[in-house]
A protein has these predicted regions:
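Ligand-binding pockets and gating/stacking loops
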Residues: 1-345
Length: 345
């Protein structure tokens, strides 16, 4: 299984995992490196919980050849938008896994997206591409969650409704050459599994966790985005991802906060977007949430079978700008990995 955490907008890796303390101040940034529990490895002093668990993480500092403009397609497909694309577009990796391996548990979708919609289109997931809608990620966020249980309808009545729907579909089957009805069939099967078993709904109900566990991850308001065109800062999405993996999902995607810190005022003109301000706000919350996820995976014996990948679409400029921010830098970036039975540290 894989949990992919997309840091919307591209995080400043040289202020997190690849500090340059001996460089001039306009390059070195606001932080000092701190030692970790891995000999010779240092990370940002604002990430103390990760530093204590660095033997459970791997930092890749050599990612390159990204496109310079924002586009989540890079993180979800491993491809840029340059060059010729197939009809329908490239599928994101969750859709590919869903196509090849299918569901691990009949009542839990194989690919689940916990990504919040972003008003800036390129920040959103690219979708199933040429694989078609049958391999889209299941999206349980929002008001539809209350519809994932049967309200006064027996399973017999539900089965009768499914049979009636199938008979109507058959009238159109021969005339359909687009593959759309194949997607409808997949959605119907998925919906039946969700409605006739409580496993998915229970996994999404975080009140089933103890208050102490929820506190370990930290809290956030999904209705409040730091920048309206990014994702909200909700570390409990990491907790939901872990619960969904336990419920049988193969792939869970999460988008987290907004990391496009060019300096000056943010997109709404209501907050200071300098790295000196935003990093002090974001780093501690991220540090707490991601380490809680990794601790949970190890404590529950999921670390061998569940890989966690954390990254953004590119790196940030080595030199701090006149606005006290870092701009886009596609030449090099980093990724953070954990679990998956990999050798870490």
């Amino acid at each position: 299984s894989v949990i992919l955490v997309y840091l919307v907008g591209g995080p400043p890796h040289q202020d997190m995992f690849d500090l340059k303390p001996d460089a001039p101040r306009e390059i070195a940034g606001p932080w000092k490196p701190t030692a970790t529990n891995v000999n010779g490895v240092e990370i940002c002093e604002a990430l103390p919980m990760m530093a204590q668990r660095m033997d459970k993480f791997t930092v890749i500092r050599s990612l390159n050849d990204a496109q310079a403009g924002h586009d989540a397609v890079q993180c979800y497909t491993g491809r840029t938008n340059a060059g010729q694309k197939p009809a329908g577009g490239w599928p994101q990796f969750g859709s590919l896994v869903n196509k090849i391996q299918g569901q691990h548990v009949p009542t839990t979708p194989g690919f689940i997206s916990l990504c919040y919609p972003c008003t800036h289109g390129p920040y959103n997931e690219p979708g199933p591409g040429y694989l078609g809608p049958a391999h889209s990620g299941f999206r349980p966020l929002g008001p539809t969650r209350k519809d994932m249980i049967l309200n006064g309808i027996t399973t017999d009545r539900l089965s009768n409704r499914k049979a009636l729907l199938a008979s109507f579909d058959q009238f159109r089957r021969d005339a359909d050459a687009s593959g759309t009805l194949d997607g409808v069939d997949a959605f119907t099967k998925q919906a039946m599994g969700i409605l006739t078993a409580s496993r998915l709904a229970e996994a999404l109900d975080l009140s089933n966790e103890s208050e102490a566990t929820r506190e370990r991850y930290g809290t956030g308001d999904p209705k409040k985005s730091i920048d309206a065109n990014g994702a909200p800062r909700v570390p409990q999405s990491f907790l939901a991802a872990r619960r969904l993996i336990e419920a049988g999902a193969r792939i869970v995607t999460v988008n987290y906060s907004k990391w496009d810190w060019h300096g000056g005022l943010n997109a709404e003109g209501r907050a200071n977007n300098s790295i000196f301000v935003r990093e002090k706000e974001d780093f501690p919350v991220f540090d707490k949430g991601i380490t809680a996820l990794i601790d949970d995976l190890y404590e529950r014996g999921l670390d061998k079978d569940t890989a966690v990948l954390v990254w953004g679409e590119f790196g940030r400029t080595p030199k701090i700008s006149a606005k006290v921010g870092r701009d886009h830098w596609p030449r090099v970036a980093c990724a953070l990995m954990a679990g998956g039975g990999m050798r870490h540290g």
